[in-house]
Swiss-Prot record:
Organism: Sinorhizobium fredii (strain NBRC 101917 / NGR234)
MF terms (GO), sorted A to Z: structural constituent of ribosome
Keyword Ribonucleoprotein appears in the UniProt entry: yes
NCBIfam families, alphabetized: L17
Name the record gives this protein: Large ribosomal subunit protein bL17
Keyword Glycoprotein: no
Subunit structure: Part of the 50S ribosomal subunit. Contacts protein L32.
Keywords: Ribonucleoprotein, Ribosomal protein
Pfam families cross-referenced by the UniProt entry: Ribosomal_L17 (PF01196)
PROSITE patterns, A to Z: RIBOSOMAL_L17 (PS01167)
Gene that encodes the chain: rplQ
Protein family membership: Belongs to the bacterial ribosomal protein bL17 family.
This protein's GO CC annotations: cytosolic large ribosomal subunit
GO BP term (any one): translation
Amino acid sequence: MRHGKAGRKLNRTASHRKAMFANMAASLIEHEQIVTTLPKAKEIRPIVEKLVTLGKRGDLHARRQAISQIRDVAVVSKLFDAIASRYATRNGGYLRIMKAGFRQGDNAPLAVIEFVDRDVDAKGAKDRARVAAEAEAAEAA
């Protein structure tokens, strides 16, 4: 019997789930908005909210705990520097989930999960920087 077992399995092994949530959390913190399926969005929300609370704590131990969970030092530094200061006065509720219709291939329910006071310019910033660098290199050549 499965009494008291919280969380969805999402048809994955435990290690696959852990890796997927780490990658999704890193992407969400980096871009501040991602599109995923509704069950995955509902599962990732408490993970990222706990990471933001770690960022608000701000000490070395909290930073190491965050690194051990999402395994990307650059994303953790953004979490602790930019995001933690943005939500310093807010007690929880850092994320919102909005339903976004159904996926065409398998009709899976989609959702947009984003930070409540998100930086609109953060989404795709890395790609814009790469495209600009490639354009400069093409002009110089």
